[in-house]
């Protein structure tokens, strides 16, 4: 893996090449812990979003942990190829990202959560110490309401710029600067429309994700906003031992809206691992 440069006093950006020849970028912090027997925390971001959204997690967790955040293909600072926008390929990218590490807590947000589940289904759990799923459906009841994702796809096809702008403004409840929001919109526009839609159209039934989640035998933390609260309680009932946490005042990007609370939760989860 090649270093590209420092992003701030703690965080370094690096790149590696996937097995299908794509340059993938990631952020790392706490590199002094990399050679130790400490836990590695790896963050997988959501649809169209960059790894830099995890900046406060990298900064605040790196004094105790080796922390990494991946820019998936087509997102952030990673290359934007014309291929590979399937659950299987994105899970393979995660597998190749995690190859150098062991005792990993994998933290997946939104689309990154189901791609983390696909990684587990394809490659197993040998490298994982625990799993954190953040504000994503996991196939439990109740299913998301009608018109949600399908309606959004229609809006994307109709007026992509407007749909992206509305989506990005809606995922935060804390105030973000217009410059920051505009930068996120521009970043999301790097990916071709059809490829961005493909990422929201994985051809799996809801039971696929539920079965993977139920079959995961290591510690699991499910962190949600109220939209998934009922799923969280059902997962805890159907998969005893699941830890859940509800962020009632945060937006979909809850780790950005309430970083201190989220970081304490991750640190507590990590320190409680067997």
Regions found by a protein language model. Give the residues of each.
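Conserved alpha/beta-hydrolase catalytic His-Asp/Glu region
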Residues: 142-147, 157-215
